[in-house]
Amino acid sequence: MEHTYQYAWVIPLLPLPVIMSMGFGLFLIPTATKNLRRIWAFPSILLLSIAMVFSLHLSIQQINGSSIYQYLWSWTINNDFSLEFGYLVDPLTSIMLILITTVGILVLIYSDDYMSHDEGYLRFFVYISFFNTSMLGLVTSSNLIQIYFFWELVGMCSYLLIGFWFTRPIAASACQKAFVTNRVGDFGLLLGILGFFWITGSLEFRDLFKIANNWIPNNGINSLLTTLCAFLLFLGAVAKSAQFPLHVWLPDAMEGPTPISALIHAATMVAAGIFLLARLLPLFISLPLLMSFISLVGTITLFLGATLALAQRDIKRSLAYSTMSQLGYMMLALGIGSYQAALFHLITHAYSKALLFLGSGSVIHSMEPLVGYSPDKSQNMVLMGGLRKYVPITRTTFLCGTLSLCGIPPLACFWSKDEILSNSWLYSPFFGIIASFTAGLTAFYMFRIYLLTFDGYLRVHFQNYSSTKEGSLYSISLWGKSISKGVNRDFVLSTMKSGVSFFSQNIPKIPANTRNKIGSFSTPFGAKKTFVYPHETGNTMLFPLLILLLFTLFIGSIGIPFDNGVKDNRILELTILSKWLTPSINLFQENSNSSINSYEFLTNAISSVSLAIFGLFIAYIFYGSAYSFFQNLNFQNSLVKKNPKKSFLDEVKKKIYSWSYNRGYIDFFYTRVFILGIRRLAELTHFFDKGVIDGIINGVGLAGFCIGEEIKYVGGGRISSYLFFFLCYVSLFLFFIP
């Protein structure tokens, strides 16, 4: 087994040969390399597959052997200082290796078809392969300085991939925003690393954990200083994992190609922050004040992300806010000491979210022939709808990913999210209430995404629409072919207008007898008559979706109890994941309340599933198709009749919708306070530099010039003038000197 561990350092290096080969090919034989560009996908996938096989072997060894292996090389600079670097293989490392390689391979396969017509195909594969290499290096690092090195490489790759289409101003701005926001966290991370090096004289994890186990409980060091340094480390995780208040870069990161959005949100960049916190949890758990702060940040993030996802029109931005919310759940779990639940949700969420993002890419790919190659149109859910009959395979996989994220059993995220909810209730009712309420919101906004995309009719064709036969699609009504007369059409149409609002908008009521006089519903693009419809993507893009579907269906089984064990006179239900994580959990005392019996699990499961079903129910009422059972019962019409006039409740709804759609005005606040504030400070500094500093210097020079101009007339070449001034200066000298 140790022989296998000795070669674990090869895993991060495996994707490098193809990166170097593509680079040399573009430099030496660019024409041939570009002509044969599709060939380069195969070695990229092959080498990452070898890394995956190696990672699986290491994971099996970890599960069977339950050991931690670390190998170090020492570089002695002088007698007082030496730099150690190496690799660490433990359960956390093996989990992340499998996660990165499996999702990375599927994204590479998907990208081969998705990016096939893009001029930057080779550049994309170079970036994404280097992204995988950087993340693999990050998770195998044995000390903080190595983590920081690969941390920066991950940030650089994300910058390049988010701004992949850099000719688009929005994409260029998005990558700059991600870069600057992450610099805040990276600066904190660097300060924290330097602080702990000053305290311990080492950057190795074993030395930091020694502090946690021995020095801090015995007041061996200044706990306030340690808490400050640990907080700075946490700040790096906050920025990387898009936690409040450094979450603003994540939705804008959707300007990159969809495959990289899947990789960032599933297994690489946003997972790096959670990984760092999980790696250092034996240190953090000895600082109760910081742990409470971590759980608070996670709670705020999970709720904020869910509320901001309620009214988004862009399918990828909606999923981005969903990622932000789910990362908040993981951060909450780590903050309350539920190490296993956090990693379990990291695994299940990664595969479910990769499935959703690649599914959204398939939807975007199918919409582009209709609306053009513009993200503002192809990603706009207002223009979708009814895609279930055009892309049935994508629809099925997307639905499974949606239900998984909603927490519907037996899909993957149900098992992990339910464990987090249970532990949060045991830790604090406040956290439990917010986490449970957000679980219902998650079901609402995720099913909203599904309904707007796949349910109803294809709305892009409702252009210059009229109910008369002169209309382009006169036979298809926005409210269905046969709607009960009792249904208020305005209520249904309100979900189509005003950006597919989260709440119904107050639109003047149309009497039933004016059905044939309904005005047009138009979109500003496309031909008046078109018979182009979306179509299913190719097998190369569907294959990763089907594999991820299998993961979504069955990966939750690693957290299902299969045996009972006894520890400290308590019955513990063992799972594959708990057996896998045993060496890591032994480094610290995990929350003792995390073990619950079958009855408690069933009670909690019924509660969480009920919340999810209620969220699905509400979403179906608001965004279901015109054939909705509730519409036929005049349910919506009864809601409208209760408030026929504009009321205070309508104003509240509009305010909430506006707040959600405008991202809580957080970006606006940052723009006003930080961007404009710094710009005005720069202008003031520029004015002071030019007006005051340069003014003084230029004034001295100008004064010298003027004095020189006056004095030069004294030297006219006459000896009498020279003698006169000479005698004057001598007289003054003799007069003042005694």
From Swiss-Prot:
Enzyme class: translocase
Keyword field: Chloroplast, Membrane, NAD, NADP, Plastid, Plastoquinone, Quinone, Thylakoid, Translocase, Transmembrane, Transmembrane helix, Transport
Molecular-function GO terms, alphabetical: NADH dehydrogenase (ubiquinone) activity; quinone binding
Catalyzed chemical reaction(s): a plastoquinone + NADH + (n+1) H(+)(in) = a plastoquinol + NAD(+) + n H(+)(out); a plastoquinone + NADPH + (n+1) H(+)(in) = a plastoquinol + NADP(+) + n H(+)(out)
Domain of life: Eukaryota
Translocase as UniProt keyword: yes
InterPro entries cross-referenced by the UniProt entry: NADH_UbQ_OxRdtase_chlpt_su5_C, NADHpl_OxRdtase_5_subgr, ND/Mrp_TM, NU5C-like, Proton_antipo_N
Mode of membrane association: Multi-pass membrane protein
Matches recorded under Gene3D superfamilies: 1.20.5.2700
Entry's transmembrane regions: 9-29, 39-59, 89-109, 125-145, 147-167, 185-205, 219-239, 258-278, 280-300, 327-347, 354-374, 396-416, 425-445, 542-562, 610-630, 691-711, 717-737
Localization, UniProt: Plastid, Chloroplast thylakoid membrane
EC number: 7.1.1.-
Pfam families found in the cross-reference section: Proton_antipo_C, Proton_antipo_M, Proton_antipo_N
Signal peptide span: none
The keyword Endoplasmic reticulum belongs to this UniProt entry's keyword annotation: no
Gene Ontology cellular-component annotations: chloroplast thylakoid membrane
GO biological process, one term: ATP synthesis coupled electron transport
Function statement: NDH shuttles electrons from NAD(P)H:plastoquinone, via FMN and iron-sulfur (Fe-S) centers, to quinones in the photosynthetic chain and possibly in a chloroplast respiratory chain. The immediate electron acceptor for the enzyme in this species is believed to be plastoquinone. Couples the redox reaction to proton translocation, and thus conserves the redox energy in a proton gradient.
PANTHER family, per database record: NADH-UBIQUINONE OXIDOREDUCTASE CHAIN 5
Family: Belongs to the complex I subunit 5 family.
Subunit architecture: NDH is composed of at least 16 different subunits, 5 of which are encoded in the nucleus.
Name of the protein in question: NAD(P)H-quinone oxidoreductase subunit 5, chloroplastic
Source organism of this protein record: Saccharum officinarum (Sugarcane)
Gene name in the database record: ndhF
